[in-house]
């Protein structure tokens, strides 16, 4: 849709309708979902709506060639039948969630791009401004944010503390919360920049600490669109797709392909 003909609220509402999301979709049993669970929920809704979502943090299967989140966080490819979103999983969990929401907005707008705004969304490009605003509206609806911010203010919490509190109530980073507050003229530019700088230092420490590589097969199948894997498995079993082609499409082989499918089944139960 043309950028100038749609408002943030209109586009966010259209996306919620198609994906089957409520205004508080990220709240379950009175508590906010973790960024990881919110991502899984939003990804599942995308897949059900026909949007392919794939993740990877390395080049192919080469663990010695990580994708740099400083260079790009995500991208979207627009297609009438199978739009695709790719997420760089070296980014933080909350960063991945915001990137997914941002790319969803791009698909609705109909504009392809590579998203690499690492710490705060300050692009002046009209499409980027719109998509960042829509992503924020999907993850932190303005009406809910204003209500919770006022509650924090009434409890005499200063701006940095209020940002920290709200970052526990919404599945987004403190930077995104702070930007929401800045856009609403609730904090100053100086306060916002201080939060950005603090978050940057914290993320740099997290990156250097590293972590476990996890289960290979769980990691492998989580990179691929679940709907794609299900249909590929069905096509192979029906003889419409050869095993060699399935191996090529999934970057697997005779030994690993069945285990990837088994891992998908276990995670689906």
How would you describe each model-predicted region?
Residues 1-269:
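Active-site hotspot residues in diverse enzymes, especially metal/ion-binding acidic/histidine motifs
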């Amino acid at each position: 849709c043309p950028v100038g003909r749609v408002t943030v609220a209109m586009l966010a509402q259209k996306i919620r309708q198609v994906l089957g999301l409520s205004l508080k979709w990220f709240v379950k049993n009175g508590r906010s979902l973790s960024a990881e669970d919110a991502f899984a929920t939003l990804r599942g809704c995308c897949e059900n709506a026909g949007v392919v979502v794939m993740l990877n943090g390395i080049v192919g299967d080469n663990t010695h060639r990580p994708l740099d989140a400083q260079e790009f966080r995500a991208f979207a490819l627009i297609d009438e039948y199978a739009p695709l979103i790719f997420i760089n999983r070296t980014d933080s969990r909350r960063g991945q969630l915001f990137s997914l929401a941002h790319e969803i907005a791009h698909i609705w707008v109909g504009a392809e791009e590579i998203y690499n705004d690492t710490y705060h969304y300050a692009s002046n490009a009209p499409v980027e401004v719109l998509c960042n605003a829509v992503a924020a509206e999907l993850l932190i609806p303005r009406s809910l944010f204003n209500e919770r911010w006022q509650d924090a203010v009434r409890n005499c919490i200063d701006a940095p503390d209020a940002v920290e509190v709200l970052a526990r109530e919404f599945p987004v980073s403190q930077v995104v919360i702070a930007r929401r507050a800045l856009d609403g003229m609730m904090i100053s530019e100086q306060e916002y920049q201080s939060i950005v700088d603090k978050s940057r230092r914290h993320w740099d420490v997290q990156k250097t600490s590293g972590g476990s590589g996890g289960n290979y097969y769980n990691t492998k199948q989580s990179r691929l669109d679940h709907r794609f894997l299900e249909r590929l498995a069905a096509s192979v079993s029906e003889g419409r797709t050869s095993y060699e082609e399935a191996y090529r499409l999934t970057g697997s082989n005779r030994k690993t392909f069945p285990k990837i499918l088994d891992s998908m089944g276990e995670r689906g139960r």
